[in-house]
Amino acid sequence: FIAIPLFWLFYRFEIKGRENIPKGKKFICAANHVSHLDPFLVSIAVKKPIAYMAKKELFEDNGLIFRLNIDWLGAFAVNRQKLEVATIKTVKELYKTNWLLGIFPQGGIRRNHTIEKINKGFAVIAKAAKWDVLPISITGCEKYNWIPFGAKVTVQIGKPISYELSQDELIEQWGQQVASMSHYKYIETESENSEVQDQQEF
């Protein structure tokens, strides 16, 4: 959080919906993904330490500086093709700490102004860990890998979604809320991750 004042200095932030942040309980921060700075933006908006799920390839194919950045964010490697028991165990370990979990349900960065191709894994994790999902939208940096100085970025926090809903309902509500907040088009599609196991197996 040392870098937070620098973000406020160099960028124009608008943060909406902080009143929707649950108090006194764990939850999953689930946002759309439009730039490399999204994890920092979500952490600034929520004002809590967040450990982010990241594809395992990021820990293998990038340089030291990039690796230090994702380590600083508390990121841990996951297999995007198949949700593994080890991932659920890592999430449950977070319950013993003051950290929250951060997920980008669409997987990689998407700048086509749509909410689609949502991975089912975040809903499985929410139900397995019994953590509600906090939908978050990020807009204003869709054209850039890194946000140019002076750009206006809006982070909006939606209403928490109960983990007690079915997986399909969780996915639907997340997609609808983020699309509404970002003014993106919501396209209902089948999950990209067909190998996700039912949460009862964990």
Where are these regions (language model features)?
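Helix-to-loop junction immediately C-terminal to a conserved catalytic motif
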Residues: 3-33
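Short amphipathic alpha-helical segments and helix-helix/interface helices
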Residues: 3, 42, 67, 91, ...
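Short hydrophobic helices that act as membrane-entry/anchoring signals
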Residues: 1-11, 67, 71-74
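Short acidic-hydrophobic, aromatic-tinged amphipathic segments that line or gate anion-handling sites
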Residues: 15-16, 76-79, 163
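Non-catalytic C-terminal accessory region of glycerolipid acyltransferases
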Residues: 25, 86-202
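Glycine-rich, highly charged phosphate/nucleotide-binding loops
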Residues: 10-14, 82-88
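Structured helix-beta-strand junction loops
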Residues: 9, 24, 49, 72-73, ...
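Catalytic core of membrane glycerolipid acyltransferases/transacylases, capturing the structured
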Residues: 22-82
